[in-house]
A protein has these predicted regions:
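Alpha-helix C-terminal capping/helix-to-coil transition sites in glycosyltransferase folds
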Residues: 45-46, 65, 198-199, 224-226, ...
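Phosphate/diphosphate ligand-binding glycine-rich loop within oxidoreductases
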Residues: 46-124, 135-138
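Oxidoreductase and adenylate-handling cofactor-binding alpha/beta cores
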Residues: 102-121, 163-167, 314-327
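Short glycine-/small-residue-rich Rossmann-like dinucleotide-binding loops
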Residues: 55, 74, 173, 201, ...
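Rossmann-like dinucleotide/phosphate-binding beta-alpha-beta segment
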Residues: 134-227
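Rossmann-like dinucleotide-binding domain for NAD(H)/NADP(H)
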Residues: 234-339
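N-terminal glycine-/charge-rich "phosphate-binding" loop or analogous flexible N-terminal tail
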Residues: 1-49
């Protein structure tokens, strides 16, 4: 059996593979990259582990020796988990970018509270703000309370960064215990969600998208956060889009930083070769968030940085190599819960 790659890997993936192979004490050939599912099915009998962004029922049926489906990022909402359960094939994700994703959440907080984007935009036109007097509210993070919804790898790293800034840290978890529960000032359960929201100056959404977390944040939740700030670094589907837009528009929320969205380009982004601008712009939501002054937006880039490619793909490759030779994989996803 062998490892196969069924998605387009990043530039320079060969070097990342070689390093992962060295860590796993593997000296065999690099894996084939086959993105055409019909072609990949023809190799089904040889596939021991598959690095991919999705998988079909037909491929699972054609790969009787498949020991692991490995996704090179954290989110698994693009997979049909019921089909994997039926096939008895485990799914693993990668947490190799949790540090940079946490950094992005903090960057959104700073951009909002320090008004970095409007100040930069105005100063480019010679317009000064606050040089002699503070004529607008600029919010410091020191001493504030941050509530982290989802205390996994990313949430845990956000916790550590906020601790370094002397912030009070609250956590919202589905289950008691866990690696980071003892590090927060207080951990809340799902039944205490509203109390958690009211106590948090900043709420950071790091939730995976599951049937239980879909529209987890809606009108009532934003009302409980009145005057506070909302950061989403998890999944767009965990938030009621219209409710968030209305809460920002009418001032219920002080502001929001948004990285994951509800609308994405369905085709590769085509750019003008001269200007570099997108030929066919795709707005990221059904509601016009881009018209609101109290929103900072990023195009779902929170998990990407120079170091995250090695982290995500290196961890994925090593896990696939070890699974292919019969070792127990790391970072297995609970196919019932969805994370």
């Amino acid at each position: 059996m062998a490892v196969y790659i069924a998605t387009v890997p990043p530039v320079g993936w060969e070097k990342v593979w070689d390093e992962a192979a060295r860590r796993a004490d593997y000296s065999g050939p690099r894996p084939p990259v086959i993105t055409d599912m019909s072609v990949l099915i023809q190799h089904g009998a040889d596939i021991g582990a598959l690095v991919t962004r999705t998988v079909t029922r037909e491929l699972l049926a054609a790969a009787p020796h498949l020991k692991l489906v490995q996704v090179p990022f954290a989110g698994v909402d693009s997979f049909d988990l019921a089909t994997l359960r039926e096939a008895g094939v485990p799914l693993a994700n990668s947490h190799g970018n949790h540090e940079v994703t946490a950094e992005h959440a903090i960057a959104l907080m700073f951009a909002l509270t320090r008004r970095i984007i409007p100040y930069d935009r105005d100063l480019r036109q010679g317009i000064w703000h606050g040089f002699t007097t503070m004529d607008e509210p600029v919010i410091g993070l020191y001493g504030k309370t941050v509530g982290i919804a989802g205390l996994g790898h990313i949430g845990g790293h956000i916790l550590r960064i906020c601790r370094a800034m002397d912030m009070k840290v609250l956590g919202l978890k589905r289950t008691a215990g866990g690696a980071y529960s003892d590090l927060v000032d207080r951990a809340y359960g799902p039944e205490e969600k509203m109390e958690f929201l009211r106590a948090s100056d900043f709420v950071v959404d790091v939730l995976p998208l599951t049937s239980e977390t879909e529209n987890f944040f809606g009108k009532a939740e934003f009302e409980a956060m009145r005057g506070h700030w909302f950061i989403n670094i998890g999944r767009g589907g965990t938030v009621d889009e219209k409710a968030l837009y209305e809460a920002l528009k009418d001032g219920t929320l002080a502001g929001a930083g948004i990285d994951p969205w509800w609308v994405y380009p369905q085709q590769p982004v085509a750019k003008d070769p001269v200007t570099g601008r997108m030929l066919h712009p795709v707005f990221p939501a059904h509601e016009p968030f881009w018209e609101l002054p109290n929103v900072v937006m990023s195009p779902h880039t929170g998990g990407f940085a120079d170091v995250s490619v090695d982290g995500l793909w290196g961890e994925s490759f090593e896990n696939a190599i070890r699974a292919d030779r019969g070792e127990t994989p790391k970072n297995l996803v609970d196919l019932q819960r969805g994370y």
